[in-house]
Amino acid sequence: MFRMQQRAASLGIPMCRPVEIGPCADGVYTLQTWIDGDDLEEIITELSDTRQYAYGLDAGRILRRLHSIPAPESQEDWESRFNRKMDYKIQKYRECPIHYEGGQSFIDYINANRHLLRGRPQVFQHGDYHIGNMMIDRGGRLQIIDFDRYDFGDPWEEFNRIVWCAQKSPLFASGMVNGYFDGDVPPEFWKLLALYISSNTLSSVPWAIPFGQGEVEVMLRQAAEVLSWYDGMRNPVPSWYSKGFYLQTIDGIPCKLKGPFDFSFLHEYGTVFQIFDDQDSGNICFGTERDGRRYFIKFAGAPTERGTGTPAEAVARLRTALPVYRDLRHKNLIRLAGAKEIGGGLALVFQWADGDCMGRMYPASHRRFMRLPLEARLAVFRDILSFFEYTAAQGYVAIDFYDGSILYDFETGRTTICDIDFFRRQPCVNDMGRMWGSSRFQSPEEFQLGAVLDEVTNVYTIGATAFALFGEYGRTRDNWQLGDISFTTAAKAVSDDRARRQQSIRQFREEWEAALKQEPMN
């Protein structure tokens, strides 16, 4: 194994590099370099879609490089070897007292596709290549670990453990396939992969029985999931697979787009250290740093992956947002520093605001935010109320305000509100049918074409925000973390009947403050 690790390391595979091997008492020791980082399996769901897919691409490309190491010429013919292995697994499955519902579909698929093994090449295999044997080091680079099950065989058989990758992150699994084949996946691959996964799945329950009923249940659920992916083994392309999206790197950071775009103009604002590319507005946002100062750049004009409409429409919407940030300048609103027609589009430049986002699209940040002490969340809500009251006084109605608009700086205790692009001046009428925004925070009138949108609409938004902050997004008394009076106040605000809500933000604030004075802190 040590020699094979040396060979892999010589190809530039990111891994624990072999340093030394020698005898130790009655055994053998090996010395390898240390990788300081996180298990990818543990953090993958906390990463953005872009990062998940990008790491999948990396994993596929690394595997392709690993497979450039040939198998020994003396290696047994693959067709004979793997047919023997499948026969053994089928026999063990039939002898096993526990069978899968629909398990015969795996056997039928194997028997109908054995011919695919004929003439398959053989190469060095990692032997256990999946997300559980990958790490992200402190520099953000993918690292491969645990080579102790290495083997030689069909390079495509190495994908048989992609089941575990797909269960954790379909985007990562898709990226792994696309990266390996450079985006051009041959149809034969899917047929063979289904064969290899069928073989692996058959052996899972016999393997699990010695480990107890809990492990057996895991394998039964996994088999059912595999059958659902492959439509009972009738479709060789699993349902989790995605062709992905175009990835472009800016200062070493990936972003997803519909196609290439020239972002060289960003260097006017320094080096990019963060990218936000999941907006459906058509905007793409960047954190940049120049001469020790940080900026938040919101840009319209690029072909963003999730954007609806054309880049030109996104530019027009962002241009409309410019006076909103100027008119609603407030101590808790992200500070606009300027705007510029640049790069074939429009950039709004803000001073950078540190903080964790409450939005559930950022799982790690969201969890940290929601673990804030009750007193801190109450302070955040006071800041939001202050901004909403100011918004109403300036003659605006808040459209598309949601948890993703709220940042909290754990160092300073400061609340920052951002992403108010769709706020509108009153009088305002619903001219879309379904207005921009998250349905969790939208009033009924924001779904009714021609309905009036006003301060009473924003009372609903404030009530929904209260339930997000103090009721775990639910609207039942059981989840509410404050007292009965404040619950009644918030419930009144989210009434479907506009006439039953508080009729102004000020009225809500006064009722809210009065309720808190009558309630003991938990």
Predicted regions and their residues:
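ATP-binding glycine-rich loop module of kinase domains
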Residues: 1, 273-275, 281-323
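ATP-binding pocket architecture of kinase catalytic cores
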Residues: 1-77, 339-342, 346-351, 356-361, ...
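An alpha-helical support segment within catalytic cores of ATP-dependent transferases
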Residues: 23, 57, 64-127, 178, ...
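Helix-rich C-terminal or lid/interface subdomains of diverse kinases
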Residues: 53, 57, 118, 161-241, ...
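Active-site Asp-x-Gly
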Residues: 122-124, 137-190, 420-447, 451-459
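Catalytic-loop of the protein kinase fold
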Residues: 124-126, 131, 388, 392-409
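Conserved protein kinase catalytic/activation segment
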Residues: 134-143, 405-419
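Juxta-kinase regulatory segment immediately upstream of eukaryotic protein kinase catalytic domains
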Residues: 240-274
